[in-house]
């Protein structure tokens, strides 16, 4: 132990978190630098990063502080938010998060650190939870199939619009929108429709009867609470070849007829009130359900049931050929990250309460609403009828009512000068009903009114069909039962709490506990997104400070935090480019150049903006072909809108010519969009806004430590140079069609000078600040790391990737390297030659890694037949070596196949992964020993992950699409079948 005297400042150790976040210690870093042949992190960085893009100065951010100091600072920020009683509704409702779900899902790294379930065998637990979610949504809506979540209700409605356009027989270009949809939904529909030349017509359902359109969107119950009978309208729309989309409320559907029963083709909504807090607008899991005929055009992830190699039921992502990572510019949507963690919470809420419990919650909510309506009517107040939980109170002095409400700590919905909305929910109490009645000069004897008041649900639209009949929704109603069920699912999966997840282009880094703690504070979770501005002063400060941090890290001039996924950030950036060109009288600029190596969301987002995608080449070294970009920029000079590139490239290298590429595009009037998916290789080292890029999206769920949640939530901020800043998404809703006029009046913190109030771009998310309640995670990360810590994190990410590439070089070729033979923060291992010599392909290696307890690297992207590895800075040398040892052992097994020591077909790679059931069976039929199957390295005998299923049959799953809970009898032993 060192006895060297230390100063008090040294002993205070303000940078302690940096050492917790970065995996290798200084001694390990020195050893790893020796392996890669460089004397220091700075020397390695200089050898990798082109000199003409490197930042000349450190980030102008404060120094690192400790976890305790950061938590105290953010607690002070949170205290500026005011938690009031909210009855605003408009798609957001109070709910009780069951504590067993809060602790064991939302606060559990086994759930929140998992990745999207591309590797089915290690994702069975969360896929079961998601298929429960799909069953919940399909059952309640009366549809045949539902997806595994979308970003929010408004974007889901926009996806329904484009699904209807693709699928309807009608040749019309008009989409009819119910004038009582939620205002944020209408606003987002306007954003999405305009670039696609879709005409929106807004009106009453009666007017829709006469409209010629390819589809109709109805709100049921509507935004003001009314429950309409739309069966005749559905028949009329179908007669014209159109489709009927419905935005709905899952809790209401426990009591009123399912949309599928009266003619809906597509149903969307938000599952937020199933146990997920307001969170100032997000994140929440939206959903889409549809008729079976449209399943192959439905956006978003879809969990299906297949079988494994032993013939047992197994879950997998199904119908993936619909998705952006495969179809690219022909994709049905640009949706990638969705809201898996929140969908899991909602599904567990339904499992915990079951159908009877949900009905009880719904009936109680409705009874309170009916009692309040009766009290108001008794005082001469005009209240709408045929409602579930929302009252439209008319012919009043709305300003006076709001003033009384605010004085009482109550928030009501602002509609106009003579009307307010009151939405009740699971959290509403008898005392709330009394207090609400008093605002209008009414008294409420709750028991007397309860005895005298009939329900307000329309008799002709009462639900008569059963729902959630599967045993999973009727078994786990005690806390012990649910606790053990959730634990059993978590045990089936591999997440970051067990192992590194070396997925290239995914940046699976530490999601520190201290970063996660503020997310569950009510000061962040209990703020309604439409609450009066003075109640969200803490959010205002948080958002200002985080935007400033991101501006400094990127070199851009302005940031929007509204996009609630990377794909939405891309879309926002491309919309800003489109609007900029139009403001200059250059609406004809519609060509978007995209390299063939780009992420699939890039071309999908471009086509959603009405752009024409032109693909550019890559050279033999994996670099963007600069000559091809120059040639195509010149060819399309008059029409060039943008170039989309990823930097460092998706091939894992820092390309030398990025500045020249930007100059070439600008010379022909185009804008440069730099995909920020690989920003983890840049923070503190280089800034895209300084080398010529005009716009980027970032992934806070990658670079800035928001966890992936098994496939969401995410945040995809859009960062731009000053000339594009006016075209960022506005943070408010325009008044129109008699609906509520504002979300913070277009910028709740305009006093800060951040420019929110001057932004005129269309909204890309339902809430003004997207998934606001998880922004504290990134704020905490930057605050605890400080300027020097962020730079060191980037440098260690570069080191870890090069360490893996160097140590694996005798066994696997790294497909692409940059100058000095180095990679960026990830490397592509070329295993294609091995398939020729042994019959073993990338998928076999991916599955065999499961036997070693690892999630596979990214499979066959960006180059088919390869593995892309990104270790991140958070992985220690020990964990890197463990992965390297596994890969070397796999290469030895392949060599044994090449040498004839293992059979070309009956070998541990072809049959991986191996389950405990298989290796412990009384009969073992394989030509290789059980021990090799189960324990290919001695260390695995100390700690072993057993996959719950053998290799999943993808072909069977796509031929036999089943996307609901597996019938219990499917689990019977073969001998009993």
Swiss-Prot record:
CDD domains cross-referenced by the UniProt entry: GDC-P (cd00613)
Name of the protein this chain belongs to: Glycine dehydrogenase (decarboxylating)
SUPFAM superfamilies tied to this protein: PLP-dependent transferases (SSF53383)
Disulphide-bridged cysteine pairs: none
Species annotation: Xanthomonas axonopodis pv. citri (strain 306)
Top-level EC class: oxidoreductase
Cofactor: pyridoxal 5'-phosphate
Family, as annotated: Belongs to the GcvP family.
Transcription listed as a keyword: no
BP-aspect Gene Ontology terms: glycine decarboxylation via glycine cleavage system
Assembly and interaction partners: The glycine cleavage system is composed of four proteins: P, T, L and H.
Annotated EC: 1.4.4.2
